[in-house]
UniProtKB/Swiss-Prot annotation:
Catalytic activity: Transfers a segment of a (1->4)-alpha-D-glucan chain to a primary hydroxy group in a similar glucan chain
Designated name of the protein: 1,4-alpha-glucan-branching enzyme
Superkingdom of this protein's organism: Eukaryota
Source organism of the structure: Dictyostelium discoideum (Social amoeba)
One GO location term (cellular component): cytoplasm
InterPro entries in the cross-refs: A-amylase/branching_C, Branching_enzy, Glyco_hydro_13_cat_dom, Glyco_hydro_13_N, Glyco_hydro_b, Glycoside_hydrolase_SF, Ig-like_fold, Ig_E-set
Keyword Phosphoprotein: no
Keywords: Glycogen biosynthesis, Glycosyltransferase, Transferase
Subunit composition and interactions: Monomer.
Gene3D superfamilies given in the database record: Glycosidases, Golgi alpha-mannosidase II, Immunoglobulins
Enzyme class label: transferase
EC annotation from Swiss-Prot or TrEMBL: 2.4.1.18
Active site: D338, E391
Length: 678
């Protein structure tokens, strides 16, 4: 039998999973493709890290003598730089072409030493396309674009402020337990408006800190022409969204987050790009195969977007440099890679692909997998503390194992099956039909040594056509029965109870990190719907109702206080970085789940009506236990049926394959956490 424990050819992952052995040649081939690419980069570009600094060569780069502008446009016949600086003269500033399809121009300073292109002025390229026609385009590496109300097509903007923001704070140390707050700057205001980086800095960051999260994951930062795309139809990859403010204001916001001890992750979209031609990458040089695959392979029919050719040298440079740019320029601490499933399969995840034959079969786009691994290796070489998260739904084996062992080098994957299962349960199943084994399995089923970020709901579950978990649970009664001055109705009682239980069991059993979408911590009602023609361009559902939790007469504050207590308990006991939980009980009739993790005992009673006194549960260790958190406390909207200060003593009586056991009272629809104190 082969010993893979010391393998250096990419097959070390087989040591922990013998089921991978039949696919060892595929694993080796993929590993070698990455190694060979890195070697080629070292020979032709200096190194992978130097290759990722493309933004220092391409695009606009200001020197003491003037401005260099370079662009890769292999099929263009003529290229001219035009803008306010030359009164939009179409021929006064021609670019020169080299043998690799790279065009360049140097614009010297004015005679007085000032930059010839004024800061904030509009700028574009005018080029003779592959078909011989002339047209305007936005430079691919542009760092600023802006729209007007009259014209939704972006204009390029030359960004060169006299005073650039200087960071004052270093990034915090990477925590061993990630508690992620997913946020969208534009919809972070409680007013029906598009919010800003500055307002987010002043209002949302303090809330995130108070809630006990240690990381913010920012959506929709990369520029996108269509606001209602939620930021997932990117037009300009090096430009941050101008709707929310300036690059300097985003830097100040991130710097403030770092001062507060918060990491900041970017939701990066490299899985596809907007089809926009006039202000996007599409047909930049007049061809459909410039940055993308040609023909049908270059189009995502469901998303109506373009698909990158990850095997192209300059596409790799562009995307790797894009990641490096956000680290170097904006000090982002990590990335959530959007749409990884779509990237790594030629069917884009639209066909079932959840077996080893699928993971190592012919439907995998190995160029895309090669790019993703290179991206992770580059980022982790640049700074080992950078965190990378894959939005990947099929559970592709080895994706989150180190590259040195044969993996894709991601730090985490999103546990995307968990929120789908919760929504399925609350939508389709009666409480009496909830299966405890199914719940325990969906939360604990993850690959060995591949970390998961668990979540009960993210932005995906809140989009129009769906609704938040709280709204599924309580629906229209949230409009009329959330007041603490009126008697709690059965629907509100059930919804409040299950909302707390679902979040705690997801955090404590579901993974190695935890994520929450902004506002859902207090049971945000309704759904998210960005302004569009179908809703008369309304911002009513593209905001966060922070006023609901601030109102002491409403029950939202109780849900929020439970979330704070849950995060505080996690920070103290660190269950997210602890070993897998030991599940000692999944009782279908009693609707009870019991498990141990981080030296704590977690007890959940999902039964809609039955409470149990002197209920025996197992424990792996003997001693005296006390309640450190329960969902039935008054401050959390509970019924105060569980004593906070009562001690529970184990007995030398084996129970459910545990050496010891203890008796507890478990009211219906409650959860509690016991800590050993002696």
């Amino acid at each position: 039998m082969t010993d893979y424990s010391k393998a250096t050819d990419g097959t070390k992952v087989i040591h922990d999973d013998p089921w991978l052995e039949p696919y060892k040649e595929v694993i080796k081939r993929r590993h070698n493709q990455v190694k060979n690419t890195i070697q080629k980069l070292e020979e032709s570009e200096g190194s992978l890290l130097k290759f990722s600094q493309g933004y220092e060569y391409f695009g606009f780069n200001v020197t003491k003598d003037g401005v260099n502008y370079r662009e890769w446009l292999p099929s263009a016949h003529e290229v001219y730089l035009v803008g306010d600086f030359n009164q939009w003269n179409k021929t006064s500033h021609p670019l020169e072409r080299d043998n690799y399809g790279r065009w360049s121009i140097f614009i010297p300073n004015n005679s007085n030493g000032e930059c010839a292109i004024p800061h904030g002025s509009k700028i574009k390229i005018y080029l003779k396309l592959a078909n011989g026609n002339f047209d305007y385009r936005i430079p691919a590496w542009i760092k600023r674009v802006e729209q007007t109300k009259e014209n939704p097509v972006f204009d390029g903007v030359f960004w060169n402020p006299s005073k650039q923001y200087v960071f004052k704070n270093k990034s915090p140390m990477k925590p061993t337990e990630l508690r992620i707050y997913e946020a969208h700057v534009g919809m972070s205001s409680e007013l029906p408006e598009i919010s800003t980086y500055s307002k987010f800095k002043d209002t949302v960051l303090p809330m995130v800190k108070e809630l006990g999260y240690n990381c913010i994951q920012l959506m929709a930062v990369m520029e996108h022409a269509y606001y209602a795309s939620f930021g997932y139809q990117v037009t300009n990859f090096f430009a941050i969204s101008s709707r929310f403010g300036t690059p300097e204001e985003l830097k100040e916001m991130i710097d403030k987050a770092h001062e507060m001890g918060l990491l900041v992750f970017l939701d990066v979209v490299h899985s596809h790009a907007s089809k926009n031609v006039l202000d996007g990458l599409n047909q930049l040089d007049g061809t459909d195969h410039h940055y993308f695959h040609s023909g049908g392979r270059g189009n995502h029919e469901l998303w109506d977007s373009r698909l990158f050719n990850y095997g192209n040298w300059e596409v790799m440079r562009f995307l790797l440099s894009n990641l490096r740019f956000y680290v170097d320029e904006y000090h982002f601490d990590g990335f959530r890679f959007d749409g990884v499933t779509s990237m790594i399969y030629t069917h884009h995840g639209l066909s079932p692909a959840c077996s080893y034959d699928d993971y190592f079969g012919g439907a995998v786009d190995e160029d895309a997998l090669n790019y993703l691994t290179l991206a992770n290796v580059m980022l982790h070489t640049l700074n080992p503390s950078i965190v990378t998260i894959a939005e990947e739904v099929t559970g592709l084996a080895t994706l989150c194992r180190p590259f040195s062992e044969g993996g894709g080098d991601f730090d985490y994957r999103l546990a995307m099956g968990i929120p789908d299962k919760w929504i399925e349960l609350v939508k389709e199943k009666k409480d009496e039909d909830w299966n405890m084994g199914t719940i325990a399995h969906m939360l604990s089923n993850r690959r060995y040594k591949e970390k998961n970020i668990a979540y009960a709901e993210s932005h995906d579950q809140s989009l129009v056509g769906d609704k938040t978990l709280a709204f599924w649970l309580m629906d229209k009664e949230m409009y009329t029965n959330m007041s603490v001055t009126t008697e709690e109705t059965p629907i509100i009682d059930r919804g409040m109870s299950l909302h707390k239980m679902i979040r705690l069991i997801t955090s404590s059993l579901g993974g190695d990190g935890y994520l929450n979408f902004m506002g859902n911590e207090f049971g945000h009602p309704e759904w998210v719907d960005f302004p569009r023609e179908g809703n008369n361009n309304s911002l009513h559902h593209a905001r966060r109702r922070w006023d609901l939790y601030r109102n002491p007469l409403l029950r939202y504050k109780q849900l929020r206080d439970f979330d704070i207590a849950m995060n505080k308990a996690e920070q103290e006991f660190r269950w997210l970085s602890s070993d897998f939980a030991y599940i000692s009980l999944k009782h279908e009739d009693d609707k009870i789940i019991v498990f141990e993790r981080a030296s704590l005992i977690f007890i959940f009673n999902f039964h809609p009506s039955k409470s149990f006194s002197d209920y025996r549960i197992g424990s792996g260790v003997p001693g005296k236990f006390i309640n450190v958190l329960d969902s039935d406390r008054k401050e959390f909207g509970g019924h105060v049926r569980i004593g906070k200060d009562n001690y529970h003593y184990t007995e030398d009586k084996p129970w459910h394959d545990r050496k010891y056991s203890l008796l507890i009272y478990i009211p219906s629809r409650t959860c509690l956490v016991l800590k050993k104190v002696d």
